[in-house]
Amino acid sequence: AIENSDNSSVVSFQPVSFPGRDQFIDEKKKKKQRYTLTHMVHDVKNQLGVTEPMRDWFPLSGMGPFSDLTDLLIDHNAKFGAVNCGCHPSCGVGTILFVNKKTKQMVPLLEFLDLEQFAKDVTVITDGNLPKPIAMAQTAIALIRNFRPERAPNGYDLLTLFRQFLSQTGARGNKVGEFESDATEFDWRVLFVAGMWFQDLFTYDFRRTEMCIIPYG
């Protein structure tokens, strides 16, 4: 995905779980073969040398405020809105990497953007439900507030981040998906890395099942 960052935008890991009744699996085998999201997060750090496990990873549902912002910024009469991942906080985790198409250098987004505070700011913006020009200005101010230029990749400025944010969230134009790809526009491409949590008897959570966003027959 890194070598082909101009064509790849998402990598999703599927952890190992033991379906059904697992009373016949001894503790030694379970400990050896179970691979959880925690293992994945630390392996990305240990094997790729990027991301900080406690800083750069967040629940997939944490992207909800940005879906709401996209819906606010596009035409209210649009046939389709943004995809909103309203799953349980324990459903999965994700992180955002910026990959340079030429050098293949990787930088976590949260290295130079306070995403937690930015999400809170975006929630205030969407709750205000003001006209698009005002919401756009508020979003720009929120990015200015949370951008850390001294930690950003060389040559990557606030204006580029703002343009790329609108593009990646589908918020430019009058409808989601109006612009199919921005692969040729930016030197740094967004690579979203995520992992799903498949439950087993060892960690089953009924509330998480109730909030699952993947339909099962």
Feature names for model-found ranges:
Residues A1-S67, H88-G92:
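Conserved C-terminal portion of the radical SAM core fold
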Residues D75-G217:
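Radical SAM enzyme core and accessory elements
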Residues M63-A78:
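Charged, glycine/proline-rich intrinsically disordered loops and linkers
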